[in-house]
Structures are given as structure tokens and as C-alpha cells.
Amino acid sequence: MRGTAAVALQPAEEDTRIQTADGSGADSVALPPGLQTVYFGNGCFWGRQKDFVDVEMKQLGRKPEQLTALVGYAAGTRTGPDGKVCYVYSDPRTHYDALGHAEVVQLGLSTDPGVAKAEIRAFASRYFDQFRKTPGGMQRLDPQDKGPAYRNVIGIPGGVNSPFFRIIQEENKYGMKLQEGRGNAMSWRGPTEDDILNTVWVVDSSQLPFYRAERYHQFHNGLGKVFPMEYLRDLRNLVSGQGRIEPTGCPELPF
């Protein structure tokens, strides 16, 4: 997004591992009631949010008040004090990258199995469209953003054991490696789940929950792309009015 994130390692003596699988400490208001959480990450989350909003509105027929695409952090094994996961303009103990998380876009799926399968297929198809061919394999659209904070990751309930995983495999049109992940942990040795060309980590979103990003990251222009005011202002104001992008307790920049 803004170059390789600088990782400040967390003190080893402070145990802030994610303790529960029920989303404790994670965002509890980002999704409308009755939906299940999935997330997709591959580089800077700004432009990816717009891509998924387009899928929701144009392919799934969701109305603006029904949209679920929000940016945040996920797939790390730790949180900061008080369960916080923040961008890097904050207490170093809460930095998302140092805690092992990646930038992702959260999306909501119906609890109806048939509907959910159609939704995850649409999201997965768009996700794999967000890569381009290179001599070394499939590269994301913003390769200047490097490191585990920008790694390719998909979070679905149950991970590779999810019934959705087969759909992910079917939509993997370029044959990228789908690698089972258990969450990235940062240490002096480096990441346990790194940013690897042509590889997508697939994790269990019920074990590794989504942490909503700060308000100023939501409905943002893309890298080198200016989006319409209907997206930047009107849609953001609507979602804000629903109470779904309230301050997270992390430092905020002008909104």
C-alpha cells in the first residue's frame, strides 16, 4: 500500500495470542446480523474493497445498505493490549504487521448454503482476477507492497476443510498454490506464513477472526486510482450511519 511495512516485534513475555474461536476481541458490528464472515487479501486493501463492492452490487444484486465489504486485518495469531489490532500509526504493540496479520477485505455470506456457495464463487472469481501473469508465476496488482502484511490469504469458516474450499479450488483459474495456513506468527526468526509469489494461504476464519481497520481506511481511493464520490463519500456515509465503521480504539486520521 505504502511500501513494505516496518515490523516492530512484540515483546516475547507478553502473551497476546488469540484465545478463542468466537471472535472475542474481533469486530462485532462490521457485518449485518445473520451473515457469516469470509475474507480475502492480496496486497493493499484500498482498491480490493472497491472490487468487492462492485461484485456485491453488480453481480449479487445487493443494495448499498446491504453491502458487507470492509477493510481490516486478519490471519495473524496475536492481538495487542485490550485485543487491539491497528495500523502502524499507533502503539507498536498493536501494529497489525508485527502481530502477524495481513490487510484483507471482509465479506458476508448468507447462512443459506445454496446462496452462500453462489456468493463465495463470485467473490473467489473476482479475487483470482486480481493477479497477473509474470515469468515467476501469478503476481498481485501492487507488487511494490511486499512482506507478510500484504501476503495472499483467503479466510473461510473451516479453512481447507470447509465446503467452500472446493469452490475456491474451482475458481483458481491460474493454478496458484493453495497452501493451508494456521495463522502467521512473527518473531526474530521471521514470519511463519510469509509473502510467497504464486501462493495463497487458506485459513480458518472462525479461528482467525477479522479486525476492522480504522475509519480513514474505509472506502478509500485506490493506489493511483481515484474512485467516484458515490463510493468515497456517499457509500461511506451510509455505512457510517449504520454504525458499522465506528472508531475501533486505534488512532484515527481525518475521515
Where are these regions (language model features)?
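Flexible coil/turn and secondary-structure edge motifs
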Residues: 2-255
